A protein has these predicted regions:
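Conserved beta-strand-loop-alpha-helix hinge in the C-terminal portion
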Residues: 202-203
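P-loop NTPase catalytic phosphate-binding loop
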Residues: 1-115, 127-130, 137-197, 206-215, ...
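Short, highly charged C-terminal tails/helix-capping segments
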Residues: 116-124
């Protein structure tokens, strides 16, 4: 890859209590990341920080994105970018089609790997696909999805994504125990948890009561292999910042032409 010495895309989430950078790498086994917490505490801001870093660093490596914007107001600035497989999706039917597409893409990639003489190199050469589903609980409120549909999707996705360099970020503010538990947290080894209303909810989401003490633009981060979560804070990142970063990196925003 040209953009980084890492084989797989990485981003800076923010700073820890010691002032050092907290980074996340979209490695083969980091298939699904869960962002959860109360409304207005920075989930969309962090998604924008992640997306803009990935676009700036890995655009030339062929990284691609699918953005499901279930509310329809958070990610319009990305419309027309060449690295989007489709413009941000807002309709439940479109999002379901995208979920089916990425499962099929996993199958296609796996078939290609099996045909390769150097399977390790074939895997490393696959450009990453990042599928963001923001406020995914809205899909269920609009009557197109049931929680079992998302559970089935995640189960089938995780099965192959460890070989195919495809990744999902799920973001939600919905906090009902039945809703979260139905999705099976074992599929979500990466957790980025924002402010929670009570310690029980915090414990369930990230095995720590400390998310109740978080403020805006703060989170607890935990990934596969970590024994406990780490604190992370980040700066606000506005829609204007997104547009300026896209322009400064000479990326053509077809939506403005």
């Amino acid at each position: 890859m040209n953009a980084s010495q890492n084989k797989y895309p990485s981003v800076v989430l923010g700073l820890g209590k010691d002032g050092k950078e907290i980074t996340h790498t979209f490695g083969l086994r980091e298939a699904v990341a869960l962002m959860a917490g109360t409304c207005g505490n920075g989930r969309s801001v962090l998604i924008n920080r992640i997306l803009t870093q990935l676009i700036a660093k890995y655009f030339s490596d062929g990284i691609q994105f699918i953005i499901a914007d279930t509310i329809g107001i958070s990610f319009n600035s990305y419309k027309g970018l060449p690295c989007l497989i489709k413009d941000p999706l807002t309709k439940p039917e479109e999002i379901r089609e995208a979920m089916d597409w990425i499962l099929a893409e996993n199958e296609r990639r796996l078939a290609s790997i099996k045909e390769s003489d150097d399977k390790k190199k074939a895997i490393e050469n696959l450009p990453a696909i990042i599928f963001v589903i923001d406020e995914y609980s809205y899909l269920f409120k609009r009557g197109i999805f049931e929680t079992k549909d998302m559970g089935s999707f995640l189960r089938n996705f995780v099965k192959l994504s460890r070989y195919t360099n495809t990744h999902v970020i799920l973001s939600t503010q919905r906090r009902e125990k039945e809703f979260i538990d139905t999705l099976n947290l074992s599929y979500m080894e990466t957790r980025m948890i924002f402010h929670c209303l009570d310690e029980r909810e915090s414990e369930r989401l990230i095995s720590s009561p400390d998310a109740v003490n978080l403020k805006q633009d703060e989170l607890l981060y935990m990934n596969r292999g970590m024994n406990e979560p780490v604190f992370c804070s980040f700066e606000n990142f506005t829609d204007k910042d997104v547009k300026e970063l896209i322009k400064s990196n000479n990326l053509v925003n077809l939506g403005e032409e």
